[in-house]
Design a protein with these regions (language model features):
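N-terminal subdomain of nucleotide-sugar transferases
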Residues: 1-58
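A conserved catalytic-core segment of Leloir-type glycosyltransferases
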Residues: 35-96
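Acceptor-binding helix/loop patch of EC 2.4 sugar-transfer enzymes
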Residues: 64-82, 125-166
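Short N-terminal targeting/anchoring amphipathic segment
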Residues: 94-112, 125-127
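A short beta-strand/loop micro-motif in the catalytic core of glycosyltransferases
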Residues: 104-105, 170-179
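Helix N-cap/beta->alpha junction signal
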Residues: 108, 130-132, 179-180
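Acidic anion/phosphate-binding donor-loop and adjacent secondary structure
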Residues: 136-140, 187, 205-219
Length: 220
């Protein structure tokens, strides 16, 4: 398959979910084009590493001021700040009319707008990897965080995110999440009680790096 993989941050060994997905797809013989945003020069080495196994890696600089400007524009609306934080249309414009791709894969709530853009301007199937249910994370942070600023930010965006995620899960050909809990909560948010096309794909574990050390004694 020829896959257009859109990530609103540079995949690396810290942002392991998109990194492992991209690498695994490439190892299986798929042609993967990665579109991603970078925010600082330190990420250039990660970008060069992606080029070792991706067909194409297309990047755009995303300065912090632009993310803040995006958020300021939606503050008076009902849309969550996360939905526009990483919005940079120049990232995808060169690819909108390329019908050679079999599927578009977009990651995270911050990347979902790119998927919506493709749904509006092309006929290519779009998969959205929500990763986590952000509503669930905001509910936890607003109730449990000891950081007052974090609690305030979570409460500010919570209702917007609940409504938006409930609408968003029905906009794509397939939705992916990391855990059954995230699937359950996203499904409960779905507009009009519809059943969205959500699949659970857990984060993988590289067994060549993570395995029991037989030299270390364990408690029975």
């Amino acid at each position: 398959m020829k896959i257009l993989f859109i990530v609103p941050y540079v995949p690396n060994l810290v942002r392991v979910r998109p990194y492992n997905m991209i690498r695994s797809l490439a190892e299986r013989g798929h042609q993967v084009t990665v579109l991603t945003l970078w925010t600082n020069e330190a990420e250039q080495s990660d970008i060069e590493h992606l080029r070792e196994f991706c067909d194409v890696v297309h990047t755009i600089h995303m300065p912090g001021w632009r993310s803040l400007w995006n958020c300021a524009q939606v503050l008076p609306t009902r849309d969550p700040l996360q939905s526009v934080y990483s919005w940079q249309p120049a990232l995808v414009e060169p690819f909108l009319n390329d019908a050679s791709y079999d599927v578009v894969h977009v990651e995270h709530l911050r990347g979902a707008r790119y998927g919506l853009h493709f749904k509006q301007h092309s006929n290519i199937p779009v998969v959205w990897d929500s990763v986590d249910c952000i509503t669930h994370l905001f509910r936890q942070a607003s109730a449990q965080s000891t950081d007052r600023l974090r609690r305030w930010r979570s409460r500010l965006d919570l209702k917007r995110t609940e409504r938006y995620e409930g609408w968003l899960v029905n906009q794509f050909d397939r939705v992916l999440v990391t855990s059954p809990t995230d699937k359950q909560i996203l499904t409960s948010l779905s507009e009009n009680g519809s059943t969205p096309p959500i699949e659970v794909i857990p984060n993988g574990v590289a067994l060549q790096y993570f395995y029991p050390d037989t030299a270390v004694s364990r408690e029975a």
